[in-house]
Regions:
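Nuclease catalytic cores that cleave nucleic-acid phosphodiester bonds
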Residues: 2-163
């Protein structure tokens, strides 16, 4: 799928917002620190109650426990200029098509050029699991991932602010 880098008819949000697919996100504390330093609003979306810092820039959004409810909420709320943090490839694809920047919790950016192969690989792995093949999960989260994420989030916010 070829996704546009921006949506020309919709102006980007300025300043950008950060939307977080938060249920299994290992970098929430880092997101809060960066957001407060840069004065950027954050929406922390989950299907369970999560603790978030009490600050006007940080909003907790608790959705129903229905399958993909958090993903659906984020996909409907996101727009050009926003930055989304998620490990969910299908949500990343939806957010990219809405004109947002998307990065994974390890700092890997999802782009219009990379999302197609990520979706295809996800489908292959799902087929292998259904077929009973034992495949490993993601690599353990490391301190280097945290550093890479912080750098990627800063870069995404700088780019979003320039749009």
């Amino acid at each position: 799928m070829n996704l546009p880098p921006t949506l020309p008819n919709i102006p980007p949000r300025n300043p950008p917002r950060i939307l977080v697919d938060a249920d299994a996100c290992p970098v929430k504390e880092e997101i809060y620190r960066v957001a407060l330093r840069r004065a950027v609003a954050v929406r922390v979306v989950s299907n369970a109650h999560l603790r978030v810092p009490a600050h006007a820039l940080i909003e907790r959004v608790v959705v129903s426990g229905a399958f993909d409810a958090a993903d659906d909420w984020i996909a409907e709320a996101v727009g050009p200029g926003d930055v989304v943090v998620t490990a969910d490839i299908l949500l990343a694809e939806r957010c990219l098509s809405a004109g947002a920047a998307v990065i994974g919790p390890t700092g890997k950016p999802f782009t219009g050029g990379s999302i197609g192969s990520a979706v295809a690989m996800r489908a292959i792995m799902a087929d292998l699991r259904v077929g009973g093949d034992v495949i490993g999960g993601p690599a353990p989260f490391r301190p280097a991932d945290r550093s890479r994420f912080l750098q990627a989030l800063d870069e995404a916010l700088v780019r979003a602010g320039r749009r």
